[in-house]
A protein has these predicted regions:
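Conserved active-site tyrosine of GNAT-family acetyltransferases
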Residues: 22-27, 92, 121
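Vicinal oxygen chelate
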Residues: 1-9, 33-81, 87-117, 129-130
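Short glycine-/small-residue motifs
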Residues: 123-126
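Short hydrophobic beta-strand elements that form part
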Residues: 13-14
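Secondary-structure boundary/capping motif
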Residues: 20-23, 113-114
Length: 130
């Protein structure tokens, strides 16, 4: 066994201070399929990966404690087809989501991207390669 055997990201856990709002965001705004739902653990399927939410504080194996003031949020990137970036932008605006950066081409990355935030202030990117 070695670290070279890692094949993919199985799941990502977002530590939440606003669990209800964040659950609603990923279910209702993003439209992700709810796989498991409890007060302390919510999982959505996103392709082969699970996006999981849990409250900050004591958990199954450890206590992350309160958010560190001034700490950076994470960035989650979700890949779509090139025409879908602009369609996602229109859908998010219609749902009242504040856009951090509207659809923009990033030639050095060969990406078209769109950025916004979830209720926990994590940066969410919708991107497409071109």
């Amino acid at each position: 066994m070695s670290l070279k055997e890692i094949r993919n990201v199985d799941y990502v856990v977002l530590l939440c201070g606003r669990m209800k709002e964040t659950r609603a965001f990923y279910k209702e705004v993003m439209g992700f399929c709810l796989e498991y739902d409890s007060d302390k653990w919510v999982s959505f399927s996103v392709g082969p990966t699970l996006l999981t939410l849990r409250p900050r504080g004591p958990a199954l194996a450890w206590d992350d404690g309160p958010a560190v003031p001034g700490s950076a949020a994470i960035q989650l990137a979700f890949r779509v087809s090139p025409p879908a970036v602009d369609a996602c932008h229109a859908e998010l605006v219609a749902k009242g989501i504040a856009i951090v950066q509207p659809p923009t081409d990033l030639p050095s990355w060969r990406h078209r991207t769109l950025f916004f935030r979830d209720p926990e202030d994590n940066i969410i990117e919708i991107c497409a390669e071109y």
